[in-house]
UniProtKB/Swiss-Prot annotation:
UniProt key word Plastid: yes
Stated family: Belongs to the bacterial ribosomal protein bL28 family.
Protein name listed in UniProt: Large ribosomal subunit protein bL28c
UniProt superkingdom: Eukaryota
Species: Cyanophora paradoxa
Length: 70
């Protein structure tokens, strides 16, 4: 399974680690993904999704059905 949010599509970002002497080495900034079981009232079943922490925060405000329509 890819390290990508199943709802937003958020994935890793390429960047640099910069030392004090400004030497740059490439690094991969991974998305903060968590596996969550989320209840869907319309589907009447649990959904096991790998989602970003921003989506988990949005789930406290909106239902999963509202987020799936995005």
């Amino acid at each position: 399974m890819a390290r990508q949010c199943e709802l937003t599509g958020k994935k890793a970002n390429n960047g640099y680690t910069v030392s004090h002497s400004h030497r740059r080495t490439k690094c991969l900034q991974k998305a903060n993904l968590q596996t969550k079981r989320i209840w869907s009232p319309t589907l009447k079943r649990w959904l096991k999704l790998q989602v970003s922490t921003k989506v988990i925060k949005d789930l406290k405000r909106k239902s999963i059905d509202a987020l799936l329509k995005i």
